[in-house]
């Protein structure tokens, strides 16, 4: 029937539909009273444009600075930047709050093998979280220390060789090499070989090149009807890239879970729990890729941001070096456990993840069917809500001097007593927060302390505005963080 109509009739029909939809979104929609820019309230294309150009978190922060703690960033989506929103949206369900805000499944589709993973709905998440908590426990972390330390030793060795040749080093690449080699070993029983080769493994390269495809597919999934069909056809190459990426991970996971070994990696703990009543092989494969991505790129980003801000703030660098040398007499004393008690080191990491959150975007949820109260206002059921990390952690309403790197704010400095610390949630919040938080902190403390024990760093001029240049496609699109290293003799 559609094809029997004349082209002008179809065009007129589309124009009428767009106009009617725009009028509805602006004047009749249940979220019409929430503030936001006109185009964002009128059409999803405004949001999609900023996703496409890699500036959505930055734009969202700008909108919060302009409109306040809640912004309508798309016709069906509200963004928040407060501690109260973290509690209302992501917190534990207690008292009268019994219904959860489920993950937005448009943002979190099933794995390419069609199986649910830990990032999906609550019932599925609870089961996977119980099983995956074993390899992430403090006990497991203690048994994994030898594996992790071995790769940090290798990092120091490779950087020392390059420092003695006065080479320019891109620390972003070396942090990625380290974190991916560690997570590859913990997840698959073998590293990606990045530290040894000084090259990025092709699978990791594919992750970074395909992340824009992931965001393109998110845009496509949010556009209904004919437009979605057209864009899906146009996005077949992106889908193929994502499938290839998953197939490699699937192959590696199969190779590992068919081996018989008791080495203390993730798979040993997962398989031990699976013998009781746990994951199917397909579920292990679906979750393996998430474990590697969540535990490697984010840690590398946090380390990159931390080193950058230390190099831009000589007083903080000097204070951290003093703490390191007051704590340790020999490098062999520096371990994941011995760095736990270092107050200023912890403050530096916290502050770096505030001004440069490893995941600066929003992980959206949907309001329960009956609606819910968020920040004192009722939001009807089925709409998208979320807290934007960048907007929350760099808001002057939450933090004094929000764009300044000041580790002392985490050390009891009276100037910052009014900071809203509960707005600071780099690992998310509530029962679905990041399982790998302890592993990430342990790795970051060890790597950073060992680096500062062994080297002095000179930030090259071309990298002095490293952070300001970056765009975001879910993760920071990090440029080179170029330094020269001077080996220290102890």
Curated annotation (Swiss-Prot):
Location(s), subcellular: Membrane
PANTHER family (alphabetical): CYTOCHROME P450, P450, PUTATIVE (EUROFUNG)-RELATED
Binding-site residues, heme: 434
Xref: SUPFAM superfamilies: Cytochrome P450 (SSF48264)
Coiled coil: none
CDD domains (UniProt xref): CYP60B-like (cd11058)
UniProt cofactor(s): heme
Molecular function in Gene Ontology: heme binding; iron ion binding; monooxygenase activity; oxidoreductase activity, acting on paired donors, with incorporation or reduction of molecular oxygen
Family per record: Belongs to the cytochrome P450 family.
Carbohydrate attachment residues: 176
Designated name of the protein: Cytochrome P450 monooxygenase aclL
Organism of provenance: Aspergillus oryzae (strain ATCC 42149 / RIB 40)
Metabolic or biological pathway: Mycotoxin biosynthesis
Top EC class, one word: oxidoreductase
Function recorded in the entry: Cytochrome P450 monooxygenase; part of the gene cluster that mediates the biosynthesis of aspirochlorine (or antibiotic A30641), an unusual halogenated spiro compound with distinctive antifungal properties due to selective inhibition of protein biosynthesis, and which is also active against bacteria, viruses, and murine tumor cells. The non-ribosomal peptide synthetase (NRPS) aclP is responsible the formation of the diketopiperazine (DKP) core from the condensation of 2 phenylalanine residues.
EC number annotated for this UniProt entry: 1.-.-.-
GO annotations of cellular component type: membrane
Annotated membrane topology: Single-pass membrane protein
Main location: membrane
Record keywords: Glycoprotein, Heme, Iron, Membrane, Metal-binding, Monooxygenase, Oxidoreductase, Transmembrane, Transmembrane helix
Transmembrane segments annotated in the record for this chain: 1-21
């Amino acid at each position: 029937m559609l094809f029997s109509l004349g082209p002008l009739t179809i065009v007129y029909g589309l124009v009428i539909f767009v106009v009617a939809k725009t009028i509805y979104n602006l004047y009749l929609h249940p979220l019409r009273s929430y503030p936001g820019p006109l185009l964002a309230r009128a059409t999803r294309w405004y949001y999609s444009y900023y996703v496409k150009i890699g500036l959505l978190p930055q734009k969202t922060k700008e909108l919060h600075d302009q409109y306040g703690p809640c912004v309508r960033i798309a016709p069906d989506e509200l963004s928040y930047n407060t501690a109260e929103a973290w509690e209302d949206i992501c917190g534990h369900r207690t008292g009268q709050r019994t219904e959860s805000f489920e993950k937005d499944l448009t943002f979190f589709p099933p794995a390419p093998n069609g199986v649910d993973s830990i990032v999906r709905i609550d019932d599925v998440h609870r089961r996977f979280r119980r099983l995956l908590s074993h390899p992430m426990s403090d006990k497991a972390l203690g048994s994994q220390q030898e594996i992790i330390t071995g790769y940090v030793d290798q990092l120091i060795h490779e950087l020392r060789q390059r420092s003695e040749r006065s080479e320019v080093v891109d620390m972003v690449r070396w942090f990625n090499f380290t974190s991916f080699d560690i997570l590859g070993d913990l997840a698959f029983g073998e590293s990606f070989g990045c530290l040894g080769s000084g090259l990025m493994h092709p699978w990791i390269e594919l992750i970074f090149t395909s992340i824009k495809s992931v965001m393109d597919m998110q845009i496509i999934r949010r556009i209904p009807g004919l437009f979605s069909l057209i864009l899906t056809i146009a996005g077949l190459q992106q889908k193929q890239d994502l499938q290839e990426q998953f197939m490699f991970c699937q192959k590696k996971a199969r190779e590992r879970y068919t081996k018989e070994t008791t080495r203390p990696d993730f798979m040993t703990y997962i398989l031990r729990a699976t013998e009781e009543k746990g994951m199917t092989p397909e579920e292990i494969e679906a979750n393996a890729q998430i474990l590697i991505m969540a535990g490697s790129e984010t840690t590398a980003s946090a380390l990159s941001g931390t080193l950058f801000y230390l190099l831009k703030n000589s007083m903080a660098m000097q204070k951290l070096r003093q703490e390191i040398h007051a704590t340790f007499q020999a490098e062999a004393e520096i371990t994941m456990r011995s760095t736990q008690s270092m107050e200023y080191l912890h403050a530096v990491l916290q502050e770096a993840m505030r001004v440069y959150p490893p995941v600066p975007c929003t992980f959206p949820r949907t309001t329960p069917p009956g609606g819910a109260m968020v920040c004192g206002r009722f939001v009807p059921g089925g709409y998208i809500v979320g807290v934007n990390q960048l907007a929350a952690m760099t808001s002057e309403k939450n933090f004094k001097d929000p764009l300044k790197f000041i580790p002392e704010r985490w050390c009891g400095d009276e100037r910052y007593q009014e900071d809203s610390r509960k707005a600071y949630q780099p690992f998310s919040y509530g029962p679905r927060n990041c399982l790998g938080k302890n592993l990430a902190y342990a790795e970051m403390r060890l790597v950073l302390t060992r680096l500062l024990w062994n080297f002095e760093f000179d930030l090259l001029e071309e990298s002095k505005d490293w952070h300001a240049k970056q765009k975001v496609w879910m993760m920071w699109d990090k440029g080179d963080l170029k330094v020269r290293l001077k080996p220290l003799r102890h």
